[in-house]
Amino acid sequence: MPALILRVMTLLLLGSACAQAAQDSNADLYDPVAPANSAFVRVLNLSDSNVEVTLSGKNKPQSVTGGQFGGYRFVAPGVQRITVAGQVLEHELKANTASTVLYRDGQLQLIADQFVNEPRKAQIAFYNFTAKPAALKTLDGQHVVVDMLEHDQTGSRMVNELKIAFAAYAGDARLVDFDELFLKKGRSYSYALLPAGSGFRAITLANSIDPTE
């Protein structure tokens, strides 16, 4: 089962990252391949500025744009030291898991991502980083995709391959729309609901792996 989990997670996350690297004339001939029982971790930078992320076990830092997710990086399981803009978080990352480290107001918080062993489906992860409980629904609000989440919670759902857009709802109130994406089987996608002034904003992302060592 652990080998299956690793294979599925790699398929879900890798996506276009390898294809993009292969097209880059400066890319290394061989990209790193995640060893068995790896842990995966990324940063969501909710500051207004780009931040530098360092990770124990990795040689090069990662730059994460303000207001965006960074790519997942794979590391050996165990206690890892994650540094974002000078702030340090040490956390035990378990084998065959994925985590998102939230950088917000100068503080770090780790959120355990959810994965399902089903490469024949597309996986949706919904994050609610607002104070208002919210659910992910189809645009018309008729179908719930991920049930109501409280502040700083995440939930997931497996769906068939299709092109679709979603929206975040608080009850019957439509808060914000997410970009339309073609959800491909064997891939994973992140939908994040964030505060923006007196309203809300959305991040829609096809997840990827950053293979930088």
Residue positions per predicted region:
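Sec-dependent signal peptide recognition
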Residues: P2-L11
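Hydrophobic h-region of N-terminal signal peptides that target proteins for export
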Residues: L12-A21
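Intrinsically disordered, low-complexity polar regions and short flexible loop motifs
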Residues: A22-E213
